[in-house]
A protein has these predicted regions:
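Short, threonine-centered small-residue motifs that mark membrane-proximal processing/anchoring sites
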Residues: 3, 7, 12-28, 259, ...
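Conserved SGNH/GDSL esterase-like catalytic core that processes O-acyl groups on lipids
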Residues: 54-151, 155
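C-terminal membrane-anchoring or membrane-association module
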Residues: 294-303
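Solvent-exposed, polar/charged alpha-helical surfaces in well-ordered, non-transmembrane soluble domains
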Residues: 69, 73, 113-116, 151, ...
Length: 303
């Protein structure tokens, strides 16, 4: 009887060790792969069109690196960025008149073509890669702030996530829609806020298990409500108004009417990193549990 109990304890200890190893590996990413729009584009649109021009920084829709660049840097991994500024979640791109279901005048891609084009680069997928799938705002800009637009956008994102999982992706981060009603271009637009809420509700309800969701909406509201806590003195007007650039961009939440400053991207990247990295307390609890079981096992075997 004691032998059987001891064996059971050994199995428990082994299971906890496996769980700890799994959590550790989840944090040991070896690459970040990004799909999205101007919030993630690190120069893809610029390389093909020359947009956006200065004072936008090196093809970013900001005054410096964007969130996924800071995330990859913090995780000490290379970044494979397939995001294009203007991309909808579907076929087309807002930048050349495309929409969720069709290309525009110049064939600029949405997120579905981004994934298709990337397949030759990302397959076979490594188990240690982190995928970031973030999009949706351009769908509203092209098709309007309606539930139909949101439903299609969510379905597109779920499809991309599903395709990645079928290809073997084990770590996928899906940030939600920011509160578009807090951006300078749509400040006070209750419809923009309502559709942001609706979009996020539908997205969360349909995401497969194991996919990491980040609540961008709530975090943005937190920053706007107490900007000084995050180092911002201005949270509702753009640093760059299309003509002149403010003298202190690091104190602005928004670079232009729709995009955050690189200072804001640094902060958001830190939040993304927390979302995809196991808390140290998790390892502490597992370690304590294993130590306790080991002690019980020792007593049982010596009894």
């Amino acid at each position: 009887m004691q032998v059987r109990k001891a064996a059971s304890l050994v199995v428990c200890v082994a299971a906890m060790l496996v769980a700890m190893a799994s959590l550790a590996s989840a944090g040991a990413y070896t690459a970040v792969i990004s799909y999205g729009d101007s919030l993630s584009d690190n120069g893809n649109l610029y390389a093909h069109t020359g947009q956006p021009p200065s004072p936008y920084w090196m093809g970013r829709f900001s005054n410096g690196p964007v969130t996924v660049e800071y995330l990859a840097n913090s995780l000490h991994t290379p970044l494979m960025d397939f995001a294009w500024g203007g991309a909808t979640t579907g076929v087309g791109n807002y930048g050349d008149g495309g929409n969720q279901t069709s290309f525009g005048a110049h064939g600029l891609p949405g997120m579905q073509p981004e994934l298709s084009v990337s397949l030759g680069t990302i397959t076979p997928i490594a188990s240690t890669w982190l995928f970031v799938v973030w999009g949706g705002p351009n769908d509203f800009l092209t098709n309007g702030f309606t539930t139909a637009t949101a439903d299609t956008a969510v379905a597109n994102l779920i499809g991309i996530v599903g395709d990645l999982k079928l290809l073997g992706a084990q770590h996928i981060l899906v940030p939600g829609m920011p509160d578009l009603g807090l951006t300078p271009d749509y400040l006070g637009n209750t419809g923009a806020t309502a559709m942001s809420i609706y979009f996020n509700h539908e997205l969360v309800s349909l995401l497969p298990s194991g996919v990491i969701y980040f609540n961008t909406f709530n975090f943005m509201q937190e920053v706007v409500a107490d900007g000084s806590a995050f180092g911002f003195t201005n949270v509702n007007t753009p640093c760059f108004n299309g003509i002149t650039v403010c003298a202190n961009p690091d104190q602005y939440l928004f670079w232009d009417g729709f995009h955050p400053t690189t200072a804001a991207d640094v902060i958001l990247a830190g939040q993304f990193e927390k979302a995809v990295t196991p808390e140290p307390s998790t390892f502490l609890m597992l370690g304590t549990g294993i130590a306790g079981l080991a002690g019980v096992l020792k007593r049982k075997l010596s009894a």
